Amino acid sequence: MKKLSLLLASLCALFLVACSNQKQADGKLNIVTTFYPVYEFTKQVAGDTANVELLIGAGTEPHEYEPSAKAVAKIQDADTFVYENENMETWVPKLLESLDKKKVKTIKATGDMLLLPGGEEEEEGHDHGGEGHHHDYDPHVWLSPARAIKLVEHIRDSLSADYPDKKETFEKNAAAYIEKLQVLDKAYTDGLSQAKQKSFVTQHAAFNYLALDYGLKQVSISGLSPDAEPSAARLAELTEYIKKNKISYIYFEENASQALANTLSKETGVKLDVLNPLESLTEEATKDGEDYISVMEKNLKALKQTTDQEGPEIEPEKEENTKTVHNGYFEDADVKDRTLSDYVGNWQSVYPFLEDGTFDQVFDYKAKLTGKMTKDEYKAYYRKGYQTDVTKINITDNTMEFVQGGQSKKFTYKY
């Protein structure tokens, strides 16, 4: 149904664009962005060279957004369309199929950034029935100041490549903004590096990258809405969990109702605060001078109410134990003798990718997640295991061909 609605919107947009296809009279670029962080970062880089438009305003859930015909028309009439990642704006891949690439340049803000595995997010405070939404990969990279810098850098480089006559301006604007983000990053590093409590509990599981980059552990909690009190049964469960783990604060993505705060405080002693996922910024907040940096500063202040207090590591309320082969689960029927034909194909050695830095993000993640080795130690470890002078292996039904330095040797496999 979503694909059909997007197709109809695209068809309608063709007519709308035909009627409104006029470039900016002031000679500026016309850039359309999806949601707030992308808008803010693009605006900071483009500066006075462009009119930057925000597609998804406050009050609209970016995860659930589907573009109208009017929205598609805006994108198709733009010089550049900037989005964050297809795991956030799930409608974008379908849109790009019908977009005139010669006319509209597109920028994926995350570029080739490696994303963490995603999962189910439960946000019962929204108007979509509390069903949550699933990401194959977690797109919330903007909530780590360190990664926000990388988003800005990629937007800068992409705009510079597309509009080389404006490259100097883009670089100057980006440098000024990145300097502010670096101050923010340092504030997070200094404020959280000596955290007495490394775990924090949140109703919106959007802070994985923030936790990863600053040495914390996000623990998400389900069954809580900021504007409704939990059932008696759920309240009993929460009371036991909160007291067992000595939880002082639970973070919501928006201000919780006073009734909920009073109920939880009375039953458990826990306090409620806000960690803003910055998916949007209200007009009122903008008028008050709020922006990405000021909101992230407030998030840090809120986090420190937990991290500055001594406390035990907080365990997840419900430990997930998915039965997958990766986790050591398989049926006897899954075990079978395999023939060479099961592996037919042209296989590439991963060693060159290790050497050229392609895997560096993987080693960085692994180092932060496990704490067992540094990223450089992981790279050295895998270099030793993966090193080979065979660049390719080509497999047919019963032959294996090893390619090495432009020469190849073929062998027949006997089962």
Listing of model-derived features with the role each one plays in the protein:
Residues 1-8:
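Positively charged n-region of N-terminal signal peptides that target proteins for export
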Residues 377-415:
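Contiguous, well-ordered beta-strand patches that form the walls/edges
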Residues 82-84, 341, 346-352, 392-401:
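Beta-strand cores of secreted/periplasmic/IMS beta-sandwich domains, seen most often
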Residues 318-373:
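Amphipathic/hydrophobic helical signal segments and adjacent flexible N-terminal regions
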Residues 5, 19-330, 334, 346:
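Extracytoplasmic metal-acquisition and chelation regions
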Residues 206, 224, 368-384:
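Pocket-lining segment of extracytoplasmic ligand-binding domains
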